[in-house]
């Protein structure tokens, strides 16, 4: 892709100030924000599980978790149901301290009632990891207070110990390793130790793609990587004979592209490999509007008018706000796909 085309695409899709003509305004007015039926199914599942959790109906949660671990179901976008189960217990970071303490008590009650439950301990470790980040905040390291760092470290250590206790149980859960990778990143586990944990995770469940997202994210330059590191890892993940191939490459880029104006211009990410992965996922999960919208957006970023035009044709005037953000980004990207001009 030429330097001039890349600059044009940046102006076209990133919502920078521009003179909107009547045609653009009319196109925006016609747009229909839509909902993804697969995401709606996920939200309904989470809501049901959250109600059981909030009401301390742990005896109802336990068999659900056990069945999901055994059958390993996926939702219609490739999302693992076990991951969505744990997501249903999450506490938003903007919640007041009193709410975090309330959730802490729920988790402790769960463990007290089911002391041999792998679900209860993994859920509590995940909560403690998020509780640690609640104390630290999202500021850069030099802006975090001394007290913030102290509590951050204490809660991460509590999460690590909870995971260690869970490891003494007979049952295994794929989310144990995903939570462990998050705790290890927060504790700045040395690279060899982190990689060993990752390989152990992949040996347990080779196609559980949350592990690869966690590792790639940790290799962003803002964390513990150097430019090119996460892209190289994506190549390695795609090459694993027991992995997801091009799909995992595309999933990694889908997870990280938001850190860049244009991930294909600013990094070594390969559009042809992302394209292959997106096409594979669209064939496997045809009901997912999220994947369809991401295909349109990423093909625009990749300068692939052929795929972009075809995908926007499938979308029509329907767009998913969670993917596009502002509607003008969708309209400008679609116009480029259809005409090649702004």
What is the predicted function of each stretch?
Residues 1-2:
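N-terminal secretory signal peptides that target proteins for export/translocation
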Residues 5-13:
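Sec-dependent N-terminal signal peptides
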Residues 17-18:
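C-terminal motif of bacterial Sec signal peptides marking the signal peptidase cleavage site
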Residues 21-76:
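N-terminal mature-domain "stem" immediately C-terminal to a signal peptide or N-terminal signal-anchor/transmembrane
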Residues 59-116, 123-244, 248-276, 310-341:
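Short coil/linker segments at helix-helix boundaries
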Residues 281-325:
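Extended alpha-helical scaffolding segments
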């Amino acid at each position: 892709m030429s330097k001039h085309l890349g600059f044009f695409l940046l102006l076209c899709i990133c919502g920078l100030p521009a003179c909107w003509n009547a045609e653009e305004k009319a196109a925006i007015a016609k747009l229909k924000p839509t909902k993804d039926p697969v995401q709606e199914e996920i939200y309904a599942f989470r809501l049901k599980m959250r109600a059981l959790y909030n009401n301390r109906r742990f005896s109802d949660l336990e068999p659900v978790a056990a069945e999901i671990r055994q059958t390993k179901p996926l939702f219609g976008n490739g999302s693992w149901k076990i991951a969505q189960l744990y997501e249903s217990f999450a506490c938003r970071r903007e919640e007041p301290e009193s709410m975090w303490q309330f959730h802490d008590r729920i988790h402790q009650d769960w463990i007290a009632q089911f002391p041999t439950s792998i679900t209860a301990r993994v859920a509590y470790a995940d909560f403690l990891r998020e509780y640690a980040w609640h104390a630290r905040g999202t500021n850069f390291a030099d802006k975090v207070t001394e007290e913030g760092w102290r509590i951050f470290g204490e809660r991460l250590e509590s999460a690590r110990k909870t995971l260690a206790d869970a490891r003494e149980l007979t049952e295994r859960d794929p989310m144990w390793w995903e939570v462990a990778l998050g705790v290890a990143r927060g504790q700045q586990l040395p690279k060899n130790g982190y990689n060993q944990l990752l390989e152990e995770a992949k040996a347990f469940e080779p196609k559980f793609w949350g592990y690869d997202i966690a590792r790639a994210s940790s290799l962003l330059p803002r964390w513990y990587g150097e430019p090119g590191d996460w892209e190289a890892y994506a190549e390695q993940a795609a090459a694993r004979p027991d992995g997801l191939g091009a799909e995992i490459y595309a999933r990694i880029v889908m997870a990280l592209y938001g850190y860049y104006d244009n991930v294909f211009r600013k990094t070594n990410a390969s559009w042809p490999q992302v394209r292959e992965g997106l096409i594979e996922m669209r064939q496997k999960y045809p009901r997912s509007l999220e994947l369809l919208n991401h295909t349109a957006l990423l093909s625009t970023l990749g300068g692939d008018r052929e795929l972009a035009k075809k995908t926007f044709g499938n979308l029509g005037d329907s767009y998913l706000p969670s993917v596009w953000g502002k509607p003008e980004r969708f309209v400008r990207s679609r116009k480029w796909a259809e005409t090649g001009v702004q």
